[in-house]
Regions:
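Start-transfer (signal-anchor) and selected internal transmembrane alpha helices
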Residues: 1-33
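Transmembrane-helix signature of polytopic, membrane-embedded enzymes
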Residues: 22, 28-29, 107-124
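Short hydrophobic/aromatic helix or loop-helix immediately within or flanking a transmembrane segment
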Residues: 49-57, 63-84
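Loop-to-helix entry region of an early transmembrane alpha helix in multi-pass inner-membrane enzymes
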Residues: 82-98
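Transmembrane-helix motifs of polytopic, lipid-linked glycan transferases
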Residues: 94-110
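Membrane-embedded helix bundles of polyisoprenyl
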Residues: 115-133, 137-144
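Membrane-interface alpha helices of multi-pass inner-membrane proteins
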Residues: 126, 155-163
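Membrane-interface transmembrane helices that cradle and orient dolichyl/undecaprenyl
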Residues: 143-156
Length: 163
């Protein structure tokens, strides 16, 4: 039920922005409900428990057997610091903000109808998958976003984003 409400809110915001003929960067407001939904989750998806019990404590304690990308490690340290070393809420929030930023950029640059794209995002498996595999979802969106550089023959930019 919450997905239906969040989808409706996001689509309404997007439609209002289009009707008021506001500049396209205001469409980011339509992505805020999705960002909050992902950030406010707790014990949703397999990665929440795995991250909370094994991976995040391992990274914070410097265990070398925990394999995380360099950016993901920095997100863990920053989120834990922002939470005053009390909880992992900010870590999951930052991960979801990064994901939603790339989704927003990709959709806003490639979609003719952002409301429909939001609907497809929420009714496909990608958004719900992102609640179980946040780092994989971020990697996928960065790769999709970076494809524009291949189209423009800017291979270095593409490699920079996916590297």
């Amino acid at each position: 039920m919450i997905y239906i409400v969040v989808t409706a809110i996001s689509m309404i915001i997007s439609s209002i922005i289009v009707k008021l003929k506001m500049k396209s960067y205001w469409q980011i407001l339509a992505f805020l409900p999705l960002t909050f939904l992902g950030a406010l989750r707790a014990y949703v998806g397999i990665d929440y428990t795995t991250y909370s019990i094994i991976q995040i404590p391992g990274i914070l304690n410097g265990f070398s057997h925990i394999k995380f990308e360099p950016l993901a490690k920095q997100v863990v340290f920053l989120g834990y610091y922002l939470a005053d070393r009390q909880h992992y809420f900010y870590i999951f929030s930052l991960f979801h903000i990064i994901l939603m930023w790339f989704i927003y950029k990709y959709i806003s640059e490639n979609s003719k109808n952002i409301s429909e794209s939001l609907f497809l995002l929420l009714t496909s498996v990608f958004f719900t998958f992102s609640l179980s595999g946040i780092r994989q979802a971020i990697s996928t969106m960065i790769a999709f976003y970076a494809l524009k550089y291949l189209e423009k023959n800017k291979v270095f930019h593409f490699i920079f984003f996916i590297g």
